[in-house]
C-alpha cells in the first residue's frame, strides 16, 4: 500500500511535457494500490500540460483500490498547451476500483486571461478552445467520484466522462458556471441534489464561437468569487463576497464509508458550522463576527505560539480551558486541560497547520499555528 498526504502547499507555473503512458498529471501523478491519497488546503496555479490528454494538476494513473480525498483546494487558471478535441481536466481518474472524494474545492478559469484583445475572433477561439474541465473519469475501471460542495467558474466543463456505465458519480451541492455541457453527466443536472449548473452554450454542437465566450465572461461574477487570489494566507485562495450564492449553500455532511468528507475547517482555518457551510474552499465570515477566523489575535484570554519547536498555550483567565489540537482536515492529534500554561512536545505532533480549539464552558477560541 502507498499512503500520501499533501497539505498546505502551493504548486505554481509547472509544465509537463508531451503526454505519455507514464505521465498523467502536470503537477502530481499518483500510482498505487490499496492506499490513501490526500491533498488538502493547497493551491494549483497556472500549471500546464503539453498534451491533448492527461491532467493539468492531479492524475490517478493505473492505480487500484485507492481512497483519495481532495478538499479545500484552489485550482486557478491551469491549462493545456495542447489542442484537445474536448477539454483536459484538472483531475484525471484512471485505474480501477478507486474512490475519490472531491469536496469544498474552488475551480476558476478566466477564459480570456491569455488572449490578446487585438486577436481576430478565430485566433482567440484557438486559445479559448484548449481549456480545461474539472474532473474526467476513465470509461473503464468501476471508479467512484463523490463531488460535493465545489464551485466551478469559467472552465469549459465540470464533471465529464466518456461512458455512462462502469463508474459511480455522485454530485451534491455544487455551483458551476461553465462554457458548455461537454460530456455532461446527469448526476450534475441543474436543480438536482442542490446542484446549480449554468452554461453559456445550450449544447456543445460544433466549436464555440466568440459570442459563447462573451456570454461566459458576463457570467463569471455570478458566483460571487473575488477574481484575484488573496495573499493574506500562506496558501492563496479565492475569497467569497458577502452576497455570493455560495454562502450557506453547502451540505453539512456527506458520508463515504461512514466518514464525513466535508472538512471541518476551510483553507484559512475558519470553522464550518452546521447549517452554515459554504460552497468552495473558503468560508465567508462577516466582518461583524471576526472571531470565527482561526488565528485571530482579538482575544486576550488565550495566547498560542510556537517556541523551540513546541506549541505553547497560555491561559490568561481564572477558568480552565479544554484545549484540542486539530489538523486542518478535522483530525484531533492532542487534547488537554489548561489551567495556566501548557507546553506540547512538537516532536509528537504532525508538521503543517494545526488548529488550537479552546473552550472554557462560556466561550470558544480557535487559533492557528504552523509547525
Question: What role is predicted for each listed range?
Answer:
Residues 2-12:
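Parallel beta-helix/beta-solenoid
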Residues 72, 104, 149, 243, ...:
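Residue-level recognition of short loop/turn positions
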Residues 235, 244-290:
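Surface beta-loop-beta hairpin patches that serve as ligand-binding interfaces in beta-rich domains
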Residues 2, 15-19, 26-31:
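Solenoidal tandem-repeat scaffolds enriched in leucines and small polar residues
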Residues 294-371:
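C-terminal outer-membrane/trafficking sorting elements
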Residues 7-8, 22-23, 30-239:
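Predominantly extracellular beta-rich ligand-binding scaffolds that present long acidic/polar faces
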Residues 13, 46, 77, 109, ...:
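Residue-level signal for short segments within beta-strands and strand-turn junctions
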Amino acid at each position: 500500500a502507498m499512503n500520501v498526504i499533501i497539505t498546505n502547499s502551493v504548486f505554481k507555473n509547472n509544465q509537463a511535457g508531451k503526454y505519455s503512458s507514464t505521465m498523467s498529471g502536470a503537477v502530481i501523478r499518483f500510482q498505487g494500490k490499496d492506499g490513501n491519497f490526500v491533498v488538502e488546503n493547497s493551491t494549483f496555479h497556472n500549471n500546464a500540460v503539453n498534451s491533448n490528454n492527461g491532467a493539468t494538476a492531479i492524475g490517478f494513473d493505473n492505480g487500484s483500490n485507492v481512497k483519495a480525498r481532495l478538499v479545500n483546494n484552489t485550482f486557478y487558471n491551469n491549462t493545456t498547451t495542447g489542442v484537445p478535441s474536448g477539454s483536459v481536466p484538472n483531475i484525471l481518474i484512471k485505474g480501477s476500483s478507486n474512490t475519490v472524494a472531491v469536496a469544498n474545492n474552488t475551480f476558476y478559469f478566466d477564459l480570456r486571461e491569455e488572449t490578446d484583445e487585438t486577436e481576430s475572433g478565430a485566433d482567440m477561439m484557438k486559445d479559448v478552445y484548449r481549456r480545461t474541465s474539472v474532473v474526467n473519469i476513465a470509461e473503464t475501471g468501476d471508479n467512484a467520484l463523490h463531488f460535493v460542495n465545489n464551485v466551478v467558474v469559467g472552465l469549459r466543463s465540470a464533471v465529464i466522462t466518456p461512458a455512462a456505465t462502469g463508474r459511480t458519480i455522485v454530485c451534491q451541492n455544487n455551483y458551476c458556471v461553465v462554457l458548455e455541457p461537454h460530456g455532461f453527466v446527469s448526476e450534475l443536472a441543474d436543480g438536482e441534489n442542490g446542484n446549480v449548473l449554468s452554461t453559456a452554450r445550450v449544447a456543445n454542437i460544433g466549436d464555440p464561437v466568440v459570442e459563447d465566450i462573451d456570454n461566459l465572461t458576463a457570467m463569471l461574477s455570478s458566483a460571487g468569487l473575488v477574481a484575484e487570489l488573496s495573499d493574506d494566507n500562506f496558501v492563496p485562495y479565492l475569497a467569497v463576497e458577502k452576497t455570493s450564492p455560495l454562502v450557506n449553500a453547502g451540505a453539512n455532511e456527506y458520508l463515504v464509508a461512514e466518514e464525513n468528507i466535508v472538512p471541518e475547517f476551510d483553507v484559512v482555518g475558519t470553522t464550518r458550522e452546521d447549517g452554515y457551510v459554504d460552497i468552495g474552499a473558503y468560508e465567508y465570515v462577516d466582518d461583524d463576527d471576526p472571531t470565527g477566523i482561526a488565528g485571530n489575535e482579538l482575544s486576550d484570554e488565550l495566547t498560542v505560539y510556537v517556541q523551540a519547536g513546541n506549541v505553547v498555550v497560555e491561559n490568561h483567565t481564572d477558568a480552565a480551558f479544554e484545549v484540542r489540537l486539530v489538523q486542518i482536515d478535522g483530525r484531533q492529534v492532542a487534547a488537554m486541560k489548561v489551567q495556566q500554561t501548557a507546553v506540547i512536545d512538537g516532536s509528537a505532533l504532525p508538521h503543517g497547520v494545526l488548529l488550537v480549539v479552546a473552550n472554557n464552558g462560556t466561550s470558544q477560541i480557535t487559533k492557528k499555528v504552523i509547525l
